[in-house]
A protein has these predicted regions:
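Acidic, Mg2+-coordinating phosphoryl-transfer loop and its flanking beta/alpha structural elements
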Residues: 75, 128-167
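Short amphipathic alpha-helix with an adjacent loop that forms part of the alpha/beta core around
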Residues: 174-180
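Conserved Lys-Pro-Asp/Glu-containing loop-to-beta segment of HAD-superfamily phosphomonoesterases
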Residues: 108-138
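Conserved H-loop
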Residues: 27, 92-96, 123, 168
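Conserved donor sugar-nucleotide recognition element shared by glycan-biosynthetic enzymes
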Residues: 17, 53, 106-109, 167
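A short, structured active-site edge motif that brings together acidic residues
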Residues: 8-10, 92-107
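N-terminal helical cap/lid subdomain that shapes the substrate entry/recognition surface
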Residues: 1-58, 65
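Substrate-recognition element of Asp-dependent hydrolases with the DxDx(T/V) motif
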Residues: 57-86, 101
Length: 180
């Protein structure tokens, strides 16, 4: 399989991951899919600590925290993996909750978000989902909450524009939503 450039990835990647694998010509079900997914996660575990935070990420979550706004992190990543990443970057004190999926296939994000919102002591609060994929927009729609999309993540600005949700290009632009 040829190397996938970041620009190509941001145009092609999608949820569910099974569909993305299929588009790449990889197995999307059965034991072959499980093996490829497990292999990816094994490689990811070797290198994840090399992944830096996005520019302004720490400053933004710190500033939002200083405003007294509760922040939760919702991810399609397996929850224990996401919590490890958050702890590694010393961000755990900024989040009321870290919610991920129960599997390595990035499946079940809407269900996990729904469960969190229905059982959280914050369930009657106003929410803003900040994401970087079309699926994040879909999650926000399913939950009936506002969505703001970041153009330097998994999906390109061109792809995100299909949603009609507002788009930011740098994470520090998120602060404008809280400081207005």
């Amino acid at each position: 399989m040829p190397e996938l450039l970041i620009e190509e990835y941001r145009e092609q990647f999608d949820f569910p991951v099974r569909d993305y694998y299929k588009r790449l010509g990889l197995p999307d079900k059965g034991s072959e899919f499980s093996e490829i997914s497990s292999h990816f996660i094994e490689k990811y575990h070797i290198h994840w600590k090399e992944c830096p935070l996005q520019k302004y990420a720490r400053e933004v979550v710190s500033t939002i925290d200083s405003l007294g706004v509760y922040q939760s992190l919702l991810s399609a990543g397996k929850e224990d993996h996401v919590k490890s990443f958050v702890r590694h970057h010393n961000l755990h004190d900024y989040f009321f909750a870290v919610v991920g999926t129960t599997n390595i296939y990035a499946e079940g994000k809407i269900d996990r978000a729904t469960s969190f919102m229905n059982t959280s002591v914050l369930k009657d609060q106003r929410y803003l989902l900040v994401g970087d994929t079309l699926h994040d927009h879909e999650v926000a729609q399913a939950l009936g909450i506002d969505c703001l999309l970041f153009s330097k993540g998994h999906h390109s600005e061109k792809k995100l524009a299909q949603t009609g949700s507002p788009i930011i290009h740098e994470l520090d632009q998120l602060l404008e939503w809280f400081l207005e």
